[in-house]
Amino acid sequence: MIESIRINLILLLAFFICTSCIVPESTHVNPTFHLLTKTIFDQSGTGIGLSVLPENNKTALSQPFYLRQIELPYYLQENRIVSRPDEAKIEFRENDRWGEPLQEGLGRVLGLNLSQFLNSPFYSVYPQRKKIGTPYEINITILRFEKVSQSEVLIEASWEIFNMEFKNGSYPSQNGKLNRLVEITPTDRGPVTTKDEIKSLSDSLGLLSELVSDSVISSSH
């Protein structure tokens, strides 16, 4: 009798040990990380053609510039990608995230775009140090940068251009604002994907870069 009880206890203990080793199937989904990309211009070079610029505006081209730290609202500093279906509501996506801090990604892409528009390969972007003798400093504030519907993203931004060669270099010589909806175009004739959304956000930075470049050129005279 005692031997039978002992065997049953051993079997019961073995059962609990075996069942405790079973790992439930994980429902975790690895997030996808996304990067903004620069605007691709035509093969002739810059987005602003040298031949169409007034003679007194060409002095801004090929000159170094410094892009200061991009200013962002707090909710855009998350690495989770944001949607904002209405003014009072934001949605964070767990499975779609930025592959770099958005502040740095915006600076990287805007710097590349501006370099192409202004035909200026010698530039610096925060957190890099400003190059000695840089005549232009650019301050950009991004207020909105997100998907607002299934078919559109919104960019809202403002900027200031500082011409350090003027006596009043501590004050902006040019400034401007942009508030633009950009259509999300599916790449594969199917439903809109996050990849399409990121492409449209990148395109919106191209629009912003073109306007900022115009301001830089205007500040040169």
PLM feature segments, named:
Residues 90-97, 166-208:
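Short secondary-structure boundary motifs at beta->alpha junctions and helix caps
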Residues 20-99, 103, 218-221:
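A structural "domain/chain start" motif
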Residues 1-9:
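Bacterial N-terminal signal peptides that target proteins for export
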Residues 8-19:
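Bacterial N-terminal signal peptides
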